[in-house]
Amino acid sequence: KRPDHDRHRAHLDRVYRQAADTDIGIAALMVLSGNGTQFIQGLQTGSYRGLHWQSVNIGALEEILRLKAVSHYRKIQQAVSLEQALALSKEFRVLCAARETGAGSIAINRFIADSLTKRAGTDFYQGRLCLVTGNTPREQLFNGDIGLCWPDQDGVTRVWVETVTGLKAWHPAN
């Protein structure tokens, strides 16, 4: 018999992955505690470290993404080493309030990937960021970790993830 999950709720109240020099953890806690409107107001006035509000109409979204996101992610693709690529990958993120709208994470990720893969010709191209969506404690992989596609010493594309014990590589199919 399956447990009745509808009667149980888990609430996360600590943020572990975000850098100490940004307020993304504060942002998440504000939204989770019902202070979303207050958070948006602060975001629009530049009150949070490491977060920038980009208001744009849907018609201009692709141009903004091309100028800001795609240009940054191309720098990751062109990095001279895995270490440089990983450092660059931490400098910029696109956060979306929704998943399945024209300006949601699915559409934005697809646009960025299509812009970057025209040259690469594969789904797992050098410089692609991969989000871990499950927990595998024995492998030190946790939901929300971000990996980076990069070739190993033999030229085989791997997804590299920084863990508490250092960099680890996995085959993209995993």
Regions found by a protein language model. Name each.
Residues 1-130, 136-139:
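Conserved helicase motor core of P-loop NTPases
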Residues 110-174:
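Conserved nucleotide-binding/hydrolysis modules and their immediate coupling elements
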